[in-house]
Amino acid sequence: MLGKVASRVSLRSRERKLRLFLDLLAPGPETTVIDVGVTDAPFGGGSTDNFFEALYPWPERLTAVGHTSLERFTAAFPQVTAVRADGRDLPFADGAFDLGFSNAVVEHVAGGREEQRRFVRELCRVAQRVFVTTPNRFFPIEVHTLVPIAHWLPRGARDRILRARGFDDVLEPLGPSELALLFPYSVRVVNRGMTLIAVGPL
Protein backbone atom coordinates (compact mmCIF):
# COMPACT_ATOMS: atom_id res chain seq x y z
CA MET A 1 0.00 0.00 0.00
CA LEU A 2 2.75 2.44 1.01
CA GLY A 3 4.65 1.54 -2.15
CA LYS A 4 1.65 2.38 -4.34
CA VAL A 5 1.16 5.71 -2.59
CA ALA A 6 4.86 6.50 -2.99
CA SER A 7 4.69 5.65 -6.70
CA ARG A 8 1.71 7.96 -7.23
CA VAL A 9 3.41 10.79 -5.34
CA SER A 10 6.60 10.20 -7.31
CA LEU A 11 4.79 10.28 -10.64
CA ARG A 12 2.96 13.50 -9.80
CA SER A 13 6.23 15.08 -8.71
CA ARG A 14 7.89 14.09 -11.98
CA GLU A 15 4.99 15.36 -14.06
CA ARG A 16 5.30 18.72 -12.29
CA LYS A 17 9.03 18.78 -13.01
CA LEU A 18 8.39 18.15 -16.70
CA ARG A 19 5.80 20.95 -16.83
CA LEU A 20 8.26 23.32 -15.15
CA PHE A 21 11.00 22.29 -17.60
CA LEU A 22 8.67 23.01 -20.53
CA ASP A 23 7.53 26.32 -19.03
CA LEU A 24 10.94 27.69 -18.04
CA LEU A 25 13.08 26.47 -20.92
CA ALA A 26 10.41 26.47 -23.65
CA PRO A 27 11.80 23.71 -25.90
CA GLY A 28 10.29 23.15 -29.32
CA PRO A 29 10.30 20.35 -31.90
CA GLU A 30 13.80 21.28 -33.08
CA THR A 31 15.38 21.69 -29.63
CA THR A 32 18.09 19.14 -28.83
CA VAL A 33 18.03 17.84 -25.25
CA ILE A 34 20.39 15.61 -23.29
CA ASP A 35 19.10 13.69 -20.25
CA VAL A 36 21.93 12.44 -18.03
CA GLY A 37 21.15 9.66 -15.58
CA VAL A 38 18.67 7.30 -17.22
CA THR A 39 18.37 3.67 -16.12
CA ASP A 40 17.61 0.42 -17.91
CA ALA A 41 14.37 0.01 -15.95
CA PRO A 42 11.08 0.41 -17.82
CA PHE A 43 8.63 3.24 -17.18
CA GLY A 44 5.22 2.24 -15.79
CA GLY A 45 3.95 -0.56 -13.60
CA GLY A 46 4.80 1.46 -10.51
CA SER A 47 8.19 2.62 -11.81
CA THR A 48 8.72 6.28 -12.62
CA ASP A 49 12.24 5.76 -13.97
CA ASN A 50 12.81 7.39 -17.35
CA PHE A 51 9.61 9.43 -17.05
CA PHE A 52 11.19 12.21 -19.10
CA GLU A 53 11.57 9.98 -22.16
CA ALA A 54 8.06 8.58 -21.68
CA LEU A 55 6.37 11.98 -21.40
CA TYR A 56 8.52 14.45 -23.38
CA PRO A 57 6.68 15.70 -26.50
CA TRP A 58 9.61 15.28 -28.93
CA PRO A 59 11.50 12.09 -27.97
CA GLU A 60 13.29 11.98 -31.31
CA ARG A 61 15.27 15.07 -30.20
CA LEU A 62 16.45 13.42 -26.98
CA THR A 63 19.84 11.91 -26.20
CA ALA A 64 19.76 9.84 -23.00
CA VAL A 65 22.90 8.92 -21.06
CA GLY A 66 23.16 6.10 -18.52
CA HIS A 67 26.18 4.40 -16.95
CA THR A 68 24.84 0.84 -17.29
CA SER A 69 23.59 -1.32 -20.16
CA LEU A 70 20.63 0.33 -21.89
CA GLU A 71 19.20 -2.60 -23.86
CA ARG A 72 15.73 -2.45 -22.30
CA PHE A 73 15.78 1.32 -22.44
CA THR A 74 16.51 1.25 -26.17
CA ALA A 75 13.68 -1.24 -26.76
CA ALA A 76 11.25 0.90 -24.76
CA PHE A 77 12.28 4.21 -26.34
CA PRO A 78 13.40 3.53 -29.92
CA GLN A 79 13.12 7.21 -30.93
CA VAL A 80 15.61 8.30 -28.26
CA THR A 81 19.36 8.18 -28.87
CA ALA A 82 20.82 6.13 -25.99
CA VAL A 83 24.46 6.46 -24.96
CA ARG A 84 26.29 4.54 -22.25
CA ALA A 85 28.75 6.89 -20.55
CA ASP A 86 29.89 8.32 -17.23
CA GLY A 87 28.03 11.56 -16.53
CA ARG A 88 31.30 13.08 -15.34
CA ASP A 89 32.99 12.47 -18.70
CA LEU A 90 30.48 12.90 -21.52
CA PRO A 91 31.52 12.08 -25.10
CA PHE A 92 30.09 15.27 -26.63
CA ALA A 93 31.46 18.61 -27.77
CA ASP A 94 31.02 21.82 -25.82
CA GLY A 95 27.51 23.20 -26.34
CA ALA A 96 26.43 20.17 -28.36
CA PHE A 97 22.87 20.35 -26.98
CA ASP A 98 20.43 23.20 -26.58
CA LEU A 99 19.22 21.96 -23.20
CA GLY A 100 20.42 19.59 -20.49
CA PHE A 101 18.22 17.70 -18.01
CA SER A 102 19.11 15.58 -15.00
CA ASN A 103 16.54 14.40 -12.47
CA ALA A 104 17.54 13.22 -8.99
CA VAL A 105 20.94 11.92 -10.07
CA VAL A 106 23.53 14.28 -8.60
CA GLU A 107 22.88 13.11 -5.02
CA HIS A 108 23.94 9.60 -6.09
CA VAL A 109 27.32 10.65 -7.52
CA ALA A 110 30.06 9.00 -5.45
CA GLY A 111 33.06 10.93 -4.19
CA GLY A 112 31.56 13.86 -2.34
CA ARG A 113 30.99 17.43 -3.44
CA GLU A 114 33.94 17.57 -5.84
CA GLU A 115 32.60 14.68 -7.91
CA GLN A 116 29.09 16.12 -7.77
CA ARG A 117 30.54 19.40 -9.04
CA ARG A 118 32.33 17.54 -11.83
CA PHE A 119 29.05 15.85 -12.83
CA VAL A 120 27.10 19.12 -12.93
CA ARG A 121 29.82 21.06 -14.74
CA GLU A 122 30.07 18.38 -17.40
CA LEU A 123 26.35 18.74 -18.09
CA CYS A 124 26.83 22.52 -18.23
CA ARG A 125 29.69 22.04 -20.68
CA VAL A 126 27.70 20.06 -23.24
CA ALA A 127 24.35 21.88 -22.88
CA GLN A 128 23.70 25.58 -23.37
CA ARG A 129 21.07 25.71 -20.60
CA VAL A 130 20.37 23.15 -17.88
CA PHE A 131 17.63 21.91 -15.54
CA VAL A 132 18.92 19.83 -12.61
CA THR A 133 16.80 18.42 -9.78
CA THR A 134 17.66 16.80 -6.46
CA PRO A 135 15.82 16.01 -3.23
CA ASN A 136 16.04 18.83 -0.69
CA ARG A 137 18.33 17.91 2.21
CA PHE A 138 16.26 20.09 4.54
CA PHE A 139 12.95 18.35 3.79
CA PRO A 140 12.22 16.12 6.81
CA ILE A 141 11.34 12.96 4.84
CA GLU A 142 14.10 11.03 3.07
CA VAL A 143 12.39 10.73 -0.30
CA HIS A 144 13.97 7.46 -1.50
CA THR A 145 12.95 5.45 1.57
CA LEU A 146 10.18 7.68 3.02
CA VAL A 147 11.89 7.40 6.43
CA PRO A 148 11.70 10.65 8.44
CA ILE A 149 15.06 12.39 9.04
CA ALA A 150 17.08 9.35 7.86
CA HIS A 151 19.25 11.65 5.72
CA TRP A 152 20.03 13.85 8.75
CA LEU A 153 21.65 11.00 10.67
CA PRO A 154 25.40 10.31 10.75
CA ARG A 155 26.52 8.50 7.61
CA GLY A 156 26.84 5.06 9.26
CA ALA A 157 23.34 5.11 10.73
CA ARG A 158 21.91 6.55 7.53
CA ASP A 159 23.55 3.89 5.38
CA ARG A 160 22.22 1.11 7.63
CA ILE A 161 18.68 2.43 7.25
CA LEU A 162 19.07 2.72 3.49
CA ARG A 163 20.39 -0.84 3.19
CA ALA A 164 17.58 -2.15 5.40
CA ARG A 165 15.14 -0.58 2.94
CA GLY A 166 16.90 -2.28 0.02
CA PHE A 167 18.57 0.91 -1.16
CA ASP A 168 22.29 0.54 -1.79
CA ASP A 169 23.06 3.59 -3.94
CA VAL A 170 25.33 6.40 -2.78
CA LEU A 171 23.32 9.19 -1.18
CA GLU A 172 24.88 12.63 -0.69
CA PRO A 173 21.92 15.01 -0.24
CA LEU A 174 22.13 18.73 -1.00
CA GLY A 175 20.56 21.93 0.27
CA PRO A 176 19.77 24.97 -1.93
CA SER A 177 23.10 26.77 -1.47
CA GLU A 178 25.08 23.55 -1.85
CA LEU A 179 23.31 22.81 -5.12
CA ALA A 180 23.93 26.31 -6.48
CA LEU A 181 27.65 26.07 -5.69
CA LEU A 182 28.06 23.03 -7.96
CA PHE A 183 27.50 25.17 -11.07
CA PRO A 184 30.10 27.16 -13.03
CA TYR A 185 27.66 30.07 -13.37
CA SER A 186 24.72 31.64 -11.54
CA VAL A 187 21.53 29.58 -11.47
CA ARG A 188 18.01 30.01 -10.20
CA VAL A 189 17.22 27.45 -7.50
CA VAL A 190 13.51 26.68 -7.17
CA ASN A 191 12.68 25.23 -3.74
CA ARG A 192 9.61 23.02 -3.96
CA GLY A 193 9.94 21.76 -0.40
CA MET A 194 10.73 18.13 -1.12
CA THR A 195 12.62 18.94 -4.32
CA LEU A 196 15.20 21.49 -5.45
CA ILE A 197 15.43 22.51 -9.09
CA ALA A 198 18.36 24.49 -10.50
CA VAL A 199 17.93 26.27 -13.84
CA GLY A 200 20.65 28.22 -15.59
CA PRO A 201 22.54 30.10 -16.60
CA LEU A 202 20.61 33.17 -15.51
Question: How would you describe each model-predicted region?
Answer:
Residues M1-G28:
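Class I SAM-dependent methyltransferase Rossmann-like catalytic core
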Residues R129-G156:
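Conserved class I S-adenosyl-L-methionine
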Residues I161-S186:
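Short alpha-helix
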Residues P184-L202:
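Core SAM-dependent methyltransferase catalytic element
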